[in-house]
From Swiss-Prot:
Gene3D superfamilies reported for this sequence: 4.10.410.60
Species, as recorded: Corynebacterium aurimucosum (strain ATCC 700975 / DSM 44827 / CIP 107346 / CN-1)
Protein name: Large ribosomal subunit protein bL35
UniProt keyword terms in alphabetical order: Ribonucleoprotein, Ribosomal protein
Disulfide cross-links: none
Positions in coiled-coil regions: none
Transmembrane segments: none
Listed Pfam families: Ribosomal_L35p
InterPro entries according to UniProt: Ribosomal_bL35, Ribosomal_bL35-like, Ribosomal_bL35_sf
Length: 64
């Protein structure tokens, strides 16, 4: 039977053309009034998935 893509992971992580895994930063959804502007600016954009997690994430995405 074919392996299914883990949809929760697929919604959160994008694969770049070179095969890198990118994810959104945490802590920027709500309760932003109490966080300094400096912190919220730093949390903009995307970040690479941790090296320790890449193998597991690729398997969930069906790219292992």
């Amino acid at each position: 039977m074919k392996q299914k893509t883990h949809k929760g992971t697929a919604k959160r992580i994008k694969v770049t053309g070179s095969g890198k895994l990118r994810r959104e930063q945490a802590n920027r959804r709500h309760l932003l009034e109490g966080k300094p502007s400096k912190r919220t600016r730093r949390l903009k954009g995307t970040e690479d998935v941790a090296k320790a997690d890449t193998k597991r994430v690729k398997r969930l995405l069906g790219r292992a």
